[in-house]
């Protein structure tokens, strides 16, 4: 088979070809004769470029450095606390992920069984507070004597009504009434101090018209008919008018006090034995003056998850003002666990038991003590936990306390009933109606949404907390990384300064020995970087080699890392 050749450029190309032949032969000949140079050339082409030096990621403090700088002990405590906190957060995230995974597996079946799964656990109850006025003086014709005599019938009616904000029709018989969400309603009226004393204006009117004689319109608003004299005898008119004026003044005083009587408090309390369903509560009273009052509305707590208020001492520790008893116990246990206040040393608690005899404990606490007698956990009381103790125990200044006693103390003393919603309201009689002027929305528990079991509800809460924690962690990660970078830079500078300090200290103590060690170390580093270790292959394969030469190997690795060779 013939070989196709490309046309050459003529003599010049042949000449250059012949001239290149001896050089090429000499090159291959030299390459075969000098394999060492060939290996060096290959090694030079395979050497990786120097990697830029990065900041170290560890925060290890050597013992000799901690001895020189005592403040590093506090830094080490912060590092240990950070490790414990990271450990707790990691365990908490694993717990929530496990709950979310269990909930996701049964999500389809639970959505079929419980249609309210995707709804929140609270609803909103809209409350309207208003009043209407009837037979008030401004509603009457003052020129009509009959209307003036009927002023004692002036009344007002205050109405407190509520409606759940949902899609249920008002005429639906299954609709939840206003009373089903309320535990109690209390209305406290603020009575004036001089209710039974006639006003200054009333007393001043007869004095101005004393020379004109008494007037029926001003004095005798409800004068009986038998006191008037139809015969028109002028001789007796003056005496009769004086008697009428006296009786009219007494009657007017009585009427004046009756129009502003002392109002007693009104209270409605839910009775489980005799429940009453209603959408509004009406309070009707006699009066022709504005009345100030305070309305207290206490929401009904859910049986599945009773809601309670926390004491100020407990709030200062766990950071929550209200919640369930489970939330309070779990939060206080987290506080004890994070601060490492839990111990199993029971001997330190014996002295406290003698001082606790005067403290009244409930039956549940005694039962818990008996149940926990076989296995007791002791809590070290810090300054925060001491604030939870009653005054009888604070006087003895205890250092420790049983965990069961502490939890029972929280349940009995620091879990308070849910505080009512207080509203200041003024009953206005200068308007026919104030409907729509005062409207407020309050949160009430959704009974249907709270019918799930605790595991499913915790799974939903855990999923929300997991997402919230992940988002917050992503937001603070750059700040943490920046602070870690600054800390590691400071530690790196401390290490470098420590090396210089130790080097110059050795030179000051024994210059010859220190310089010889420095030369040997530099020579060893050069040998490591050049790759000429000089180790026997059989020795390197044995585990004892690494155990016996650990310090030397660590130094070699540090040399390679510091020069960017790895």
Swiss-Prot record:
Keyword entries, A-Z: Activator, Nucleus, Transcription, Transcription regulation
Disulfide bridge map: none
Gene Ontology molecular function, alphabetical: structural constituent of chromatin
Skewed-composition ranges (Polar residues): 39-51
Database matches in CDD domains: SWIB_like
GO cellular component: chromatin; cytosol; nucleus; SWI/SNF complex
One GO process term, biological-process aspect: regulation of transcription by RNA polymerase II
Primary localization class, coarse: nucleus
Signal peptide start-end: none
InterPro entries: SWIB_MDM2_dom_sf (IPR036885)
Chain residue ranges for the region called Disordered: 1-56, 196-260
Biased composition (Low complexity): 231-246
Keyword Hydrolase: no
Compartments in which it is found: Nucleus
Family: To yeast RSC6.
Function statement: Involved in transcriptional activation. Component of the SWI/SNF complex, an ATP-dependent chromatin remodeling complex, which is required for the positive and negative regulation of gene expression of a large number of genes. It changes chromatin structure by altering DNA-histone contacts within a nucleosome, leading eventually to a change in nucleosome position, thus facilitating or repressing binding of gene-specific transcription factors.
Subunit comment: Interacts with SWP82. Component of the SWI/SNF global transcription activator complex. The 1.14 MDa SWI/SNF complex is composed of 11 different subunits: one copy each of SWI1, SNF2/SWI2, SNF5, SNF12/SWP73, ARP7/SWP61, ARP9/SWP59; two copies each of SWI3, SNF6, SNF11, SWP82; and three copies of TAF14/SWP29.
Listed name of the protein: Transcription regulatory protein SNF12
Organism: Saccharomyces cerevisiae (strain ATCC 204508 / S288c)
Lineage: Eukaryota, Fungi, Dikarya, Ascomycota, Saccharomycotina
Gene designation: SNF12
